[in-house]
Amino acid sequence: MTEFDGCTNGATNMYLPGCAYYVSPSEFSTKTSFLSQGSSCPVTFPYSSNLPHVQPVREMAFREYGWRRSKWQYRGSYPSYYPSEEVVARDFIQPSNRRSDVLFKADPLCAHHGTPSAASNLYSTVGRNGVLPQEFDQFYEASQPTSVPPEHVGSLDKTGSKTQEVPPKITHSPDKKMGAEGRADSPSGEVAADKSNSSATPQRSRKKRCPYTKYQIRELEREFFFNVYINKEKRLQLSRMLNLTDRQVKIWFQNRRMKEKKLNRDRLQYFTGNPLF
């Protein structure tokens, strides 16, 4: 137990790892505490403290770190709000001695953005449209359409009502491309009735076609082969024999002559090869 012989004369106030008992602080009276030394690097806090033992906050001198003075500028204890004039003076107005260093240090004087209160100070008044400031009223007035006099408004209303009163064009339901073949197969009386109905009431659907029977077509074609133009007596005879009206027989012969004329023109064009002939 010789390693503990040197520790037998101490008191029991401080514990040492090498001894089984405590040592009095009088043994270390010559050593100063490390807490009594002052701070070699004072730190600045942005808030004020009410504790009596804390020293008052003092400004910390930054040596142009990052060449951005506005970024590292000390503002002391931040108040709850800033007056707009003070903010503009501090953020936008740089000291005169800093102007010469702009070219060398590239200080972003113009690129620095102020606080919303500064912006509200510059554009504190709102223009006509309620959004942009008064400086933009000249553009707002230029973009507004010129007011129309009441006389022109009345004339415009009259012309608009006239255009609305114009009825749409009547579109005829019969197909224009229907050749003489369809005309020959349809009764002459009903064709005329369809034309009159379509001109009078274009909204109504076309009446269903009632074609001639094969017997009627055969007898009419036979008569047309011998006589292209039929007289009134023969027309009345055919109408009684085929159970048709005199008008139906007359219109059928008209359509058949148009069909024959078209067929002759097509034959001539086919053999001559001249489309203008």
Swiss-Prot record:
Gene3D superfamilies: Homeodomain-like (1.10.10.60)
Location of the region described as Disordered in the Swiss-Prot/TrEMBL record: 143-209
CDD domains the UniProt entry points to: homeodomain
Compositional bias annotation for Basic and acidic residues: 172-184
InterPro entries listed in its UniProt record: DUF3528, HD, HD_metazoa, Homeobox_CS, Homeodomain-like_sf
Single annotated GO MF: DNA-binding transcription factor activity, RNA polymerase II-specific
Keywords on record: Developmental protein, DNA-binding, Homeobox, Nucleus, Transcription, Transcription regulation
Family under the similarity heading: Belongs to the Abd-B homeobox family.
Cited PANTHER family: HOMEOBOX PROTEIN HOX-A11-RELATED (PTHR46092), HOMEOBOX PROTEIN HOX-D11 (PTHR46092:SF2)
Protein name: Homeobox protein Hox-D11
Organism listed in the record: Notophthalmus viridescens (Eastern newt)
The encoding gene: HOXD11
